[in-house]
């Protein structure tokens, strides 16, 4: 059957029929949204003078700023007390989280008139006794500090308001109607008990559920979100309720919706204006950091094209600048960017606040300079009030370490909500208790599983189960049928869609027990839209066949040995980098990479090796080691890097320095010539096109017996022997071919020694040629752990090198002739261009 029951409409009829138009009555509903809905029904349909219709919370929420202590001040007072308790050492951030729990506990003790000293007699466990002593200390100090403020706690103030309302109802002989389903709490229970002779209860009727119930299990939460968006887009002319009490999921759903009314509220910390203030505070509380600076500048409220241009300028090596003054030393393309940097430095880095109050005051000033209209933005009024209050209460946190304050600020800000609502929105997002009494054309129950729709008792962190029972403080006093009652009311709407993603946060979802109780025949498994056989196609089809190749009419004339390796392993990456000229920039937030450390080691070893004969040859082992370390420190000092990276790399350099000196001394014993960072080239003519392959050999050794070894220093992964034999790692092979072709022209000895057919090695003393049919290639792995230096050597014969040369020629012929570069061949471990080939 089609559902025709509406609780509020039924209640409106009850008001007219049973009470009459002129009856004086006070109607109390569970929440404000239900009150607004009921008023609308009464005015639109019955045209009557409205009785008093209020939510229960309004009885205890009249506010005058001076009447009670604010939540923020109370949390700060409690956290200060917790921090001063030496037997349970907690930092300021941890103490704030503990303060939130203690605040509720202490207020419950006060409201229920329970003596804190009673709790220590309920459990003789040594652990719990320590906890109870801590609680007693905090409670007594909390009462003392609250008395100094000459204000009441909010809970005591609420109790006072409630008592005043109870007296007013009794003396005025008012009739009170409690309509709907109320979440029980200490205030509501007291209200019911004291006014039992004045209260009329109007509860929802149990009706037959709708036959328009559909159930679907998307694969994950993002597919579930798309389903919600799809349903809403197909039902724009209908009134829709999305029921959830999960704020995190709500934010995901809202990303796919246009107009909606949000009854859950937004965490002010997660809004653009909240993140703007948090970013400024992080900058003021820490040493200069480009990542923190751009976290601020890329906020949507102040981001602009100049920020994007500046980010490009500061990518790669400039991303490690350690002071704002370096911003003005950049080579600017135009004066506008320079002026932007100058203004930025004046606003952010001119003043240095020394305590929390000064930080908060300066934060407000900086915010208004960066965005003069900030307080007019959504949530601006709430944020300004929060900032003003926190500044006033900063005496409780002035002793906090500056670096800890951003976390404290963020935690406190997370306690503040603001509500963003769209006029005339047909989509309402709210909790079950907000929406259960109202009528909708379509109800969507997303993420309908035990996590969200089954109440489970949780252990209290500060009280044992026995203590809770004896003290009669029930933290899980919500009636077990509460969510079942909400669910039954939702099922009496016209159409209900139940969704439950199969996975969430990497875990499988378990359907709610409430859903399992439904009769099988009452639920349609998929068809939510009449006449639609497929609910939603969630499979994204590829835009093209991945085997398609890219065509290029030209081929480069100069290649490096590393580009040859890219051509072999990742043709599309070669095309993007070498032909299109695309280069990956290291973003500002990227940490120094292992390749950056490798570049440092190459510079250090080059500097040491090239000056060895002039400066270090006669030094002892320790002095040589110190010389190597000093070279590294000098290079690090002149390199822009984060200070923590410099310290880490200094430690690594010191760790392997002795092992490298011993390695170097041992290698030199059998060498008569050594060349370092030597440039070479290999010239080829491929199908009429001249190709030059260039490379730099880290180290080339000529032994006393005229054997040649080419060495390559590696701080990263070295290729396997199989990869070298197959030509997948051709760097040292191509450098060996350069030797055969006399490609190292600046090294006279190599030119004399090398000739391609076969490799002739001449004795410099006798000038008589000695046939040598091999070249040795060696990878020297350098690490900061033992073994610090490890050498892998492979001997390549002339015949093997000639086969590799033929393979190289064939490879180049293929690409020069065919002019196609495949998408789907990718053997690289690291691929900066993978996203471009999709």
Curated annotation (Swiss-Prot):
Instruction: Give the signal peptide as a residue range, or say none if absent.
Output: none
Q: Which SUPFAM superfamilies does the UniProt entry name for this protein? A: P-loop containing nucleoside triphosphate hydrolases (SSF52540), Restriction endonuclease-like (SSF52980)
Tell me what this protein is called: Uncharacterized protein RC0550
State the organism of origin. Answer: Rickettsia conorii (strain ATCC VR-613 / Malish 7)
